[in-house]
Amino acid sequence: MSSFGYDPYFSTSYKRRYVETPRVHISSVRSGYSTARSAYSSYSAPVSSSLSVRRSYSSSSGSLMPSLENLDLSQVAAISNDLKSIRTQEKAQLQDLNDRFASFIERVHELEQQNKVLEAELLVLRQKHSEPSRFRALYEQEIRDLRLAAEDATNEKQALQGEREGLEETLRNLQARYEEEVLSREDAEGRLMEARKGADEAALARAELEKRIDSLMDEIAFLKKVHEEEIAELQAQIQYAQISVEMDVSSKPDLSAALKDIRAQYEKLAAKNMQNAEEWFKSRFTVLTESAAKNTDAVRAAKDEVSESRRLLKAKTLEIEACRGMNEALEKQLQELEDKQNADISAMQDTINKLENELRSTKSEMARYLKEYQDLLNVKMALDIEIAAYRKLLEGEETRLSFTSVGSITSGYSQSSQVFGRSAYSGLQSSSYLMSARSFPAYYTSHVQEEQTEVEETIEATKAEEAKDEPPSEGEAEEEEKEKEEGEEEEGAEEEEAAKDESEDTKEEEEGGEGEEEDTKESEEEEKKEESAGEEQVAKKKD
């Protein structure tokens, strides 16, 4: 920024208006005007004050004409010093305003970039979540599918429970059969024990019989031996008797017949005894053989019954073990199915909870984004309002600075006027001052125009030096030409306004002593005209 208030953010026409001229603040011009335009006066109070001073100067150009001759050089020097100090203050204030405005513009650019980024993110989110009802329908469809799956799992569980009840009934029947088989096994074991006991008794009886057979065989052998000995002894006796009979026969012939009779009797008796012994032995052996055969059949039947009982017991035991294994497998399968169903139900419930949480988080995120977007819109609107206010303020400053020199000189020379009841630095609040300020001479207008011309020439010289250091491009040359044209148009407009002011001053001198209400109306009309002219200039700048 140069010493003449040059700022790269502003156009040349705006820079021409920001010259180092003093600023005169008027706290209150007229009560009616301040109440009617309070909103605008909060941003453009210096503008209205300068315009009031300017009108005061233009209206009082005739009445103060004689008083100028009475001014001495000391007062003029003091006024010039005051004007210099005011210009210095104005320069500092303008630099501060330019810096603030530049910072505001940077802040606005930064916020616009952030707004663009957020709008892009919002657009992406809207595209991503363009149909929240579709997600809701998808979630609801998935929830319905999961509920149907849960119902199917419940139905399957009920079917498995029915099957489990049937298996439990089968198990109870098998357990009843098992108990019956256990009882029959115990009965068979009891009968087997009795059969074993009978077999043992039969074996003992057989052993006794075998012992008795052995003893009888020994007795038969002994009897045979005794019989043979007896036969031998009898034969010996017979031979001895025969010899003796022969001897007697020789002596007594009748003894041989007697010996034959005795031998025949003994032979008959021995044959009879042998036959009786053989018959008794045979009958006894037959009885023992029959009893042994009977006992053997009973033992064999008992053994067969025991083996059959063992086979049945083993088969029932295997069947019971198979039923137990099947029961355990079914219970294990049922437990696995229950665990699987519980796990599936818990997983489905977790999925439902997760989807509900995601839906809630998505809704909250959408609400947060909408709130942030609303906040950004509010901030953007506030910034737009603030920018519009600053634009209005800058337009008012542009309008005010075009007439600041006239107002400053008027406020400086107002110290020597007896019409004013107070200093120009105390606020210039009285209406009598405004009425007397209209009598200032017209040649101060030319002096102000000369100062503005000098300032513009200085700015153009500064721009020419900068252009030498940095050659302008085609676009910048076109912009400079446009700015020159705008400056010429503004100068023509200012000349027209000066001519209008002179004509208005002439009319005001003729009208002379009108009241404050007419002045207020005229000032409002002038302000409206200047506002329309400023808006036209702003529109031209924008174009």
From Swiss-Prot:
Phosphoserine, modified sites: S56, S67, S103, S473, S503, S523, S532
Residue stretches of biased makeup (Basic and acidic residues): 460-471, 529-543
Compositional bias of kind Acidic residues: 472-528
Keyword Cell cycle: no
Region span, Tail: 398-543
Keywords, comma-separated and alphabetical: Acetylation, Cell projection, Coiled coil, Cytoplasm, Cytoskeleton, Glycoprotein, Intermediate filament, Methylation, Phosphoprotein, Ubl conjugation
Omega-N-methylarginine modifications at: R23, R30
Region (Tail, subdomain A): 398-444
Region (Coil 2B): 282-397
Traits of the deletion mutant: Reduced levels of Nefm, Nefh and Prph in the sciatic nerve and reduced numbers of neurofilaments in sciatic axons.
PTM info: O-glycosylated. Phosphorylated in the head and rod regions by the PKC kinase PKN1, leading to the inhibition of polymerization.
Region feature (Coil 2A): 254-272
Main location class: other
Segments for region (Coil 1A): 94-125
Residue ranges, annotated region (Epitope): 382-392
Region (Linker 1), start-end ranges: 126-138
Boundaries of every IF rod domain copy: 90-401
Cellular component annotations (GO), alphabetically ordered: axon; axon cytoplasm; cholinergic synapse; cytoplasm; growth cone; intermediate filament; myelin sheath; neurofilament
Tissue-level expression: Expressed in the sciatic nerve (at protein level).
Glycosylation sites: T21, S27
Note: NF-L is the most abundant of the three neurofilament proteins and, like the other nonepithelial intermediate filament proteins, it can form homomeric 10-nm filaments.
PANTHER family listed in its UniProt record: GLIAL FIBRILLARY ACIDIC PROTEIN (PTHR45652), NEUROFILAMENT LIGHT POLYPEPTIDE (PTHR45652:SF8)
Family the entry assigns: Belongs to the intermediate filament family.
Subunit and partners: Forms homodimers (in vitro). Forms heterodimers with NEFH or NEFM; which can further hetero-oligomerize (in vitro). Forms heterodimers with INA (in vitro). Interacts with ARHGEF28. Interacts with TRIM2.
Protein name: Neurofilament light polypeptide
Species annotation: Mus musculus (Mouse)
Gene name of the record: Nefl
